Curated annotation (Swiss-Prot):
InterPro entries: GHMP_kinase_C_dom, GHMP_kinase_C_sf, GHMP_kinase_N_dom, GHMP_knse_ATP-bd_CS, Homoserine_kinase, Ribosomal_Su5_D2-typ_SF, Ribsml_uS5_D2-typ_fold_subgr. Its EC number is 2.7.1.39. Catalyzes the ATP-dependent phosphorylation of L-homoserine to L-homoserine phosphate. Pfam families: GHMP_kinases_C, GHMP_kinases_N. This is Homoserine kinase. ATP binds at P91, I92, G93, S94, G95, L96, G97, S98, S99, A100, C101. GO terms for molecular function: ATP binding; homoserine kinase activity. It catalyses: L-homoserine + ATP = O-phospho-L-homoserine + ADP + H(+).
Length: 309
């Protein structure tokens, strides 16, 4: 039996649309992510557990974990009969890499169970393919940090899919999920087909400056450059209360604030625990819309997916 935990992730980070992502873990020890268990069996079966299991497809073939098992078996050239259990702790359509959690946990669990026949690069490529089935396009900004941990920059050249960017230990990520769903496909459809030249220049300046600031250990500069001219101006209309929340968190003292992935989760970056707590309290009182919503104060999850049983 193998049990694998895969952490939540925040893609884009305002400054890196489709090319940056960070794995996150709550500072209070709460597990914000999915678990997948694989056990030997005579034939395949899949069981769903967890807080958000009721939101999953009822037909096993439509479940991404089943599709991961099927693709993994094709990849290694043999059918491996197993019982898989998905513990779905991540809300679907939240902007926290929910589908990536399931994909990464399922594939890592299968790879561990079978004695690691696939290397890291092939695993990551397969994860991107599986993620693409849900979002409509292959992208790695959730699966890469979820799998490898830390802050990841998508490279996709010279056989390299992603590489780690140094983060800052003092950064606290306040993540507020309001409890509503925004589909990745819908959030992508709202974006323009073409961008103005000045926006392209600003985006390049912000992203290059951010990576430079990370490597030269300038946290305040890095946070200041976390601006989004590509997606946020258009996606804000999908997120009730986002503009007000952003203004409030910055006034409280957040270093940066933006949309996590395609939303509706908001992230606010703080460099002091008391600031993070005040931001979390405000978001809990004003940004959450129902009982399914939550706020977590997080740090970077540097471990990524790991075997927990």
């Amino acid at each position: 039996m193998v049990k694998v935990y895969a952490p939540a992730s925040s893609a884009n980070m305002s400054v890196g649309f489709d090319v940056l992502g960070a794995a996150v873990t709550p500072v209070d020890g709460t597990l914000l992510g999915d678990n997948v268990t694989v056990e030997a069996a005579e034939q395949f079966s899949l069981h769903n557990l967890g807080r958000f299991a009721s939101k999953l497809p009822t037909a096993p073939q439509e479940n991404i974990v089943y599709q991961c098992w099927e693709s993994f078996c094709q990849e290694i050239g043999k059918t491996v009969p197993v019982t898989m259990t998905l513990e779905k702790n991540m809300p679907i359509g939240s902007g926290l890499g929910s589908s990536a959690c399931s994909v990464v946990a399922a594939l890592v669990a299968m790879n561990e169970f079978c004695g690691k026949p696939l290397n890291e690069t092939r695993m990551l490529a397969l994860m991107g393919e599986m993620e693409g089935r849900i979002s409509g396009s292959i992208h790695y900004d959730n699966v890469a940090p979820c799998y490898l941990g830390g802050m990841q920059l998508m490279i996709e050249e010279n056989g390299i899919i992603s590489q780690q960017v140094p983060g800052f230990d003092e950064w606290l990520w306040v993540l507020a999920y309001p409890g509503i769903k925004v589909s990745t496909a819908e959030a992508r459809a709202i974006l323009p087909a073409q961008y103005r030249r000045q926006d392209c220049i600003a985006h390049g300046r912000h992203l290059a400056g951010f990576i430079h600031a990370c490597y030269t250990r300038q946290p305040q500069l890095a946070a200041k450059l976390m601006k989004d001219v590509i997606a946020e101006p258009y996606r804000t209309k999908l997120l009730p209360g986002f503009s007000e929340a952003r203004q409030a968190t910055m006034e409280i003292g957040a270093q940066a604030c933006g949309i996590s992935g395609s939303g509706p989760t908001l992230f606010a970056l703080c460099d002091k625990p008391d600031t993070a707590q005040r931001v979390a309290d405000w978001l809990g009182a004003h940004y959450l819309q129902n009982q399914e919503g939550f706020v977590h104060i997080c740090r970077l999850d540097t471990a990524g997916a790991r075997v927990v049983g």
